[in-house]
Amino acid sequence: MNGLTVIAGLNDSGKSTIGKVLFVTIKALVNTLHRSSNNKERILLEQISTLYERIGELRFKSEQLNHMMPITIEAMGRKLLAMENLESRQNYLNDIINIISKEELTPRVRSLIMTDLSKINSTLNENSRFYDIKTEINDLLESEFLGSFTTVGEETSEVTLMMEDGKSNLYYKVKENKTDTASVTGQEIFLDDVTYVESSLYLHMLQSILRSRKMPEADPMVMARGLLPEHIVDMAEKIHSASRRMTVADKTAAEMNLAKIIDGKFAFDPNSGSLKFQRNEVSFPVMNVASGIKSFGVIQMLLENGIISNNRLLEWDEPENHMHPEWQLNLAEVMIQLTKAGYPILITTHSPYFLQALRYFAAMYDVEKFVDYYLAEPAKDNAATCVVREVTDTLNDVFITLAEPLNRVLNVDQARKKEAE
């Protein structure tokens, strides 16, 4: 994915599956990385709390311990985390161990305290940023695929995300629809985030979506709230948080003439707290706005809040849906402009209009070498599976595939003859 990646194909050809797998993979990395430092601190504080309870009043009775160990658990945590030098931290913990070993304690209490200190040391030495990646992948796969991820007829499926340096990658194996193994190698930073847009129609359902739970969070005993895949709630939360402040990204939106294309812009009404479409100082409920306008509104708000950027992937599943062919051309031009600005994008499509528009504007903006095309189609040896092959240099294969349904109904005269017979 060196710019814009386009996966074309007919319905039920596996296009969306590819997009969702990529979303799960990147989102798992992002979520785990964001939580790793917070989790490490939380676990450390819990371990320090146990240690302090175990030592009890000895902390205050022993002059040495009173001098070495801060009064509060939080202060102790900050002290340990601030010791970036491994040797200094180890010497500090060893000093505490030596003091404890000389105090009059029962063998069991002394042993438990030593175990606590050992756990604290292990937590501090944990340098893996992705230690909980397996659980995160499992939750996201359950959310997106509802326990039906493994290839039909196969016991296991494997996924690998390779990075540009050729050394960093995320690999995981799913066995019987559960994450069996997961590992991250290399130190390259993957991506800051990913946003998956399935439909712009969700704009007028924001409040309902935000009140719903994501799949992994759902309590099976609670039926009052809806259950939604991660990518839908993720997009809704991002759109809802979009601000109206002028940022560099907002200028990008202005340069792309988004407001001119739709003759207005989307913004949150501070009085009602709801999203509105503004045109000529008149506000309209999102539900009353054309679907095509909503699509450009999604891009506008994602740009304005920096939700998509040169290191935040945008995935859009069949953006041409509910859109007039002329607006498909406008949207294709915007996507190419984003590509030229350095934004990584993955698009799936079954529209020859949209595909040709991407091809045309890629040439017009001189970014053809940064656009890769793939065709998803049923596997010849297994109708239950699909294959995805690169067709950047053989795009006619795609147009033939997408045009085939229309070709079947082009000859009206032939249809009349059949009726006459």
Regions found by a protein language model. Give the residues of each.
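Switch/communication elements of ASCE P-loop NTPase nucleotide-binding domains
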Residues: 1-36, 274-420
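Phosphate-coordinating catalytic segments in nucleotide- and nucleic-acid-processing enzymes
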Residues: 28-311, 386-421
